[in-house]
Amino acid sequence: MNTAMEETQRIEQFLRKALVSERKHGYLIGVSGGLDSAVVLKLLVQAVGKENVLGLILPDRDTEKKSTTLARSLLEQEKVPYKVISMTPLLRHLGVYKDMPLFLLPTRGLKESIVRRFYNDYTKKLNKPVFFAQWEEPPTQLPYFYEGIAYYRIKHRVRMATLYYYAEKNDYLLVGCTNLSERLIGFYVKYGDDVCDVAPIAHLYKTEVRQLSEYLSVPEDIRNRPPSPDLIPGITDEYSLGINYETLDQILAGLEEGKTAEDLKQLFPADIVELVINQVKFTQKLEGKPYMLKRA
């Protein structure tokens, strides 16, 4: 990556050009209270001005209250107009909450504890972190396994439909907040948080986004939060992956530089290297879907 200042200027120019090229009136962004959307919001304001940005906060029943508080605070600090729209009524209407009856548990702490208990059991039986095994056939029946996957993914897809509705209603471009680390290993929901019109940080590893956040003076409360999709209580990014972003990014950067698996195994645990390499290959295959016939 360039210096933080150079990269910021490069992205801001990119955002201005995209708006002119697409002949749109501004940008719409979903703001979660997390690091990636905070960085992108800061870049948008500096690139095109707060009057050309609209923020949406889209919590649901499982969203941590602090996430919404931090998202509101950042948008108000940047003087960006925004709306808060609860996804709970639609998800309830679809019957999503019945599939994972967390509402029966009285406190968030208890919900997090139960979710992690199931997650740890899955990891033990699958012999790898659940993220790296979610596309495989489980060796044994796992309670709530597929329901949990569907529960997680539908939230991203409902959010995406909502974001696009408001983007098109205002003749805005929808800006995405997926980073390069997530893209390379498929740590996103297809037809969910990967979908957007402009992806200004998709070329930056998570650790590089973190560097930009310091340069852009993203509030410390956001910078210090563990990265989390905030869709199921108790599950953070690194808990789901079973690996921290510093290690993940070093492995991914090593692959980008042409290092072999054996080279990387001299520096990192062999099982982690294998998981990451296999996941990168699988993600490349996943991006080729849907399957289609060629013309006869």
UniProtKB/Swiss-Prot annotation:
Name by which UniProt lists this protein: NH(3)-dependent NAD(+) synthetase
Subunit: Homodimer.
Enzyme class: ligase
NCBIfam families found in the cross-reference section: nadE
Source lineage: Bacteria, Pseudomonadati, Coprothermobacterota, Coprothermobacteria, Coprothermobacterales
EC code: 6.3.1.5
GO terms of molecular function: ATP binding; glutaminase activity; metal ion binding; NAD+ synthase (glutamine-hydrolyzing) activity; NAD+ synthase activity
Organism (species): Coprothermobacter proteolyticus (strain ATCC 35245 / DSM 5265 / OCM 4 / BT)
Positions that bind deamido-NAD(+): 157, 190, 197
Binding site for Mg(2+): 36, 182
